[in-house]
C-alpha cells in the first residue's frame, strides 16, 4: 500500500468515522443511569479517555502487522479461532445490531416528527434497512457518494444546537460536585452510563487500519487519534450540556426524544423540525456506513473459506461488485433484531461484545511486546504500559459491570458469539 495519508486526512477520518447518531439519542439512557447532570458529563469524559487510550494501544498492532483489520490482528496474536470469533461476532451481533439500532431510532424519531402512531416505527425501521440495501446494491460508488454528502450534513445540527443553547440557555446546569443518583449505587450508575456513551464513540477502531498507509505514522497517528477523539469528546460534552441547558433534567431522563424537544425549544416549531430532519439524515448516514462496511465481514471470512456456504457468500455482483449474499445475510439478521429488540438493548449488546474483543486487542499489545520484542513497530503506544493498562482496565470494568447489572443481555451477546465455536470446528473438519 502507498503511504499517502496525511495528518489532516487521518484527523478527518477519526472525526467522520466516530460522530454519528449516539450523541443525539444516548443522553436519555445515560441520565437515567447516573441521575445527575454532573455525572452525565463525567461519563462522556470517561468514555472519551477510554476510547483515546484504546485507539493509541490498538494502533501499535495495526502499524506493526502487515494484515487487514482486527480479525487478522487477533489471528496473529492469539490464533485463528480468536480472529474467527471476532469476525463471527461482527457478522452476527455488531453490524446487524448497529444497523437495526440506528434504523429503530430513525423509526422512533420519524413517527414523532410526522405525528404518526408509535406502532409504525418498526415498519419504518424495516423500510430504512431495505431502502439502504437497495442503494448499496447499486454499487459502492453510489453508497460512498451518499455517505460523503451526509457526513457534512450531520455536523450542521450539532453546530446549531451548541451555539444557540450557549447563547440562549434556559436552564441552570450544576456540574459540581459530581453526584450519582442510581438505585444500584455509584459504580452501577457510572458503568451503565459508560456502556451507553461508548456507543457514540464506536468507529474509532477503523482509524487504526490507516497506520500502514500514513506518510508518518510514528508522528501523526497518535496526534490524529488524540486530537480527533479529544475534539469528538468536546463536541459530545458541549451537545449534552446544550440539551441540559435547554430542557429540565427530569424531562431528559429516559427520553429518547431529547434532541427533538430541545430543537423545538431552541428554534421553534418550524426550525426545530428542520434541525430534526438534519439529525435523521445523520442517523440515516450512520446506518448506511455500517451497512457499507458490515456486508464485507462475511465476504472476507468467506474468501478465506472460513464459513459454511463460503462459495455463495464470497460471490460479488458482476455489475456492481457488491457481495450480494453477504449483504443479504447481514440485512436479514438486522431485520430480525428490529422485530425483537429496541435501540437501547441493541446498542448495549453490541458495545459489550465489541469491548470484549477490544480488550483482548489491548492485551495483545503487551503480549507481543514480550513475545516479539524485535518486531518492527513503526508506531509505538506512548506512555507504555500506562495507556494500554487504562484501556484494559476500562474494558474489563465495562465487561464485568455489564455481566453484573445486565446479566441476560451479556449472556445473549456472549452466547451468539460462542455459537461461532461449533461453526469454526465444523468448517475445520470439512
Where are these regions (language model features)?
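Hydrophobic transmembrane alpha-helices that form the core helical bundles
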Residues: 29, 52-129, 134-137, 280-300, ...
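Helix-loop-helix connectors at the membrane interface of multi-pass transporters/channels
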Residues: 72-77, 103-124, 157, 213-217, ...
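C-terminal membrane-solvent junction of multi-pass transporters and transport-like membrane proteins
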Residues: 313-321, 358-407
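Hydrophobic alpha-helical segments of multi-pass membrane transport proteins
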Residues: 158-161, 298, 350-377, 397, ...
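Membrane-interface loop-to-helix entry segments
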Residues: 107, 120-171, 184, 202, ...
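Membrane-interface "cap" regions at the ends of multi-pass membrane proteins
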Residues: 1-38, 51-52, 56, 374, ...
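TM-loop-TM module centered on a large, flexible mid-protein loop between adjacent transmembrane helices
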Residues: 71-75, 79, 111-116, 226-288, ...
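Helix-loop-helix junctions that connect adjacent transmembrane segments
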Residues: 1, 37, 41, 114-120, ...
